[in-house]
Amino acid sequence: MDIVSLKFIGIGFMAIGMYGAALGVSNIFSSLLSAIARNPSAAENLQRMALIGAGLAEAMGLFAFVIAMLLIFS
Protein backbone atom coordinates (compact mmCIF):
# COMPACT_ATOMS: atom_id res chain seq x y z
CA MET A 1 0.00 0.00 0.00
CA ASP A 2 1.22 3.45 -0.75
CA ILE A 3 0.92 6.47 1.49
CA VAL A 4 -2.06 7.95 -0.38
CA SER A 5 -4.21 4.87 0.15
CA LEU A 6 -3.28 4.77 3.84
CA LYS A 7 -4.21 8.44 4.10
CA PHE A 8 -7.69 7.75 2.74
CA ILE A 9 -8.14 4.78 5.06
CA GLY A 10 -7.32 7.11 7.97
CA ILE A 11 -9.87 9.61 6.68
CA GLY A 12 -12.47 6.84 6.67
CA PHE A 13 -11.64 6.05 10.28
CA MET A 14 -12.20 9.72 11.14
CA ALA A 15 -15.80 9.26 10.01
CA ILE A 16 -16.22 6.85 12.92
CA GLY A 17 -15.31 9.69 15.28
CA MET A 18 -17.96 11.93 13.77
CA TYR A 19 -20.50 9.09 13.95
CA GLY A 20 -19.66 8.60 17.63
CA ALA A 21 -20.23 12.29 18.32
CA ALA A 22 -23.64 12.14 16.66
CA LEU A 23 -24.59 9.11 18.75
CA GLY A 24 -23.38 10.84 21.91
CA VAL A 25 -25.41 13.98 21.27
CA SER A 26 -28.55 11.99 20.47
CA ASN A 27 -28.10 9.93 23.63
CA ILE A 28 -27.68 13.07 25.73
CA PHE A 29 -30.87 14.67 24.45
CA SER A 30 -32.95 11.49 24.64
CA SER A 31 -31.90 11.14 28.28
CA LEU A 32 -32.69 14.82 28.82
CA LEU A 33 -36.23 14.38 27.54
CA SER A 34 -36.75 11.31 29.72
CA ALA A 35 -35.46 13.13 32.79
CA ILE A 36 -37.63 16.20 32.16
CA ALA A 37 -40.67 13.96 31.70
CA ARG A 38 -40.00 12.38 35.10
CA ASN A 39 -39.17 15.59 36.98
CA PRO A 40 -40.32 18.79 35.22
CA SER A 41 -39.23 21.02 38.11
CA ALA A 42 -35.56 20.20 37.45
CA ALA A 43 -35.76 21.09 33.75
CA GLU A 44 -33.65 24.26 33.93
CA ASN A 45 -30.71 22.59 35.68
CA LEU A 46 -30.92 19.53 33.44
CA GLN A 47 -30.96 21.62 30.26
CA ARG A 48 -27.85 23.51 31.27
CA MET A 49 -25.94 20.30 31.99
CA ALA A 50 -27.19 18.64 28.79
CA LEU A 51 -26.07 21.57 26.64
CA ILE A 52 -22.60 21.49 28.19
CA GLY A 53 -22.37 17.75 27.58
CA ALA A 54 -23.64 18.09 24.02
CA GLY A 55 -21.09 20.81 23.33
CA LEU A 56 -18.27 18.61 24.59
CA ALA A 57 -19.50 15.63 22.57
CA GLU A 58 -19.85 17.76 19.45
CA ALA A 59 -16.34 19.13 19.98
CA MET A 60 -14.97 15.59 19.68
CA GLY A 61 -16.71 15.25 16.31
CA LEU A 62 -15.31 18.58 15.17
CA PHE A 63 -11.81 17.50 16.21
CA ALA A 64 -12.21 14.34 14.13
CA PHE A 65 -13.38 16.47 11.19
CA VAL A 66 -10.41 18.82 11.49
CA ILE A 67 -7.98 15.91 11.61
CA ALA A 68 -9.65 14.41 8.52
CA MET A 69 -9.29 17.73 6.68
CA LEU A 70 -5.63 17.92 7.70
CA LEU A 71 -5.10 14.42 6.32
CA ILE A 72 -6.84 15.26 3.05
CA PHE A 73 -4.94 18.46 2.35
CA SER A 74 -1.51 17.49 3.66
Swiss-Prot record:
Q: How does it sit in the membrane?
A: Multi-pass membrane protein
Question: Which keywords accompany this UniProt record?
Answer: ATP synthesis, Cell inner membrane, Cell membrane, CF(0), Hydrogen ion transport, Ion transport, Lipid-binding, Membrane, Transmembrane, Transmembrane helix, Transport
Note the site residues: Reversibly protonated during proton transport: 58
Q: Name one GO cellular component term.
A: plasma membrane
Q: Which compartment or compartments is the protein found in?
A: Cell inner membrane
What Gene3D superfamilies does the annotation carry? F1F0 ATP synthase subunit C
Indicate whether Hydrolase appears among the record's keywords: no
Entry's Gene Ontology molecular function annotations: lipid binding; proton-transporting ATP synthase activity, rotational mechanism
Q: Does the keyword Ion transport apply?
A: yes
- Spell out the InterPro entries in the cross-references: ATP_synth_F0_csu, ATP_synth_F0_csu_DDCD_BS, ATP_synth_F0_csu_sf, ATPase_proteolipid_c-like_dom, F/V-ATP_Csub_sf
The family database entries (PROSITE patterns) matched by this protein are listed as: ATPASE_C (PS00605)
Residue spans crossing the bilayer: 8-28, 52-72
Q: How does it assemble?
A: F-type ATPases have 2 components, F(1) - the catalytic core - and F(0) - the membrane proton channel. F(1) has five subunits: alpha(3), beta(3), gamma(1), delta(1), epsilon(1). F(0) has three main subunits: a(1), b(2) and c(10-14). The alpha and beta chains form an alternating ring which encloses part of the gamma chain. F(1) is attached to F(0) by a central stalk formed by the gamma and epsilon chains, while a peripheral stalk is formed by the delta and b chains.
Purpose of the protein: F(1)F(0) ATP synthase produces ATP from ADP in the presence of a proton or sodium gradient. F-type ATPases consist of two structural domains, F(1) containing the extramembraneous catalytic core and F(0) containing the membrane proton channel, linked together by a central stalk and a peripheral stalk. During catalysis, ATP synthesis in the catalytic domain of F(1) is coupled via a rotary mechanism of the central stalk subunits to proton translocation.
Record family assignment: Belongs to the ATPase C chain family.
Instruction: Write down what this protein is called.
Output: ATP synthase subunit c
Q: Which organism is it from?
A: Rickettsia typhi (strain ATCC VR-144 / Wilmington)
Gene expressing this chain: atpE
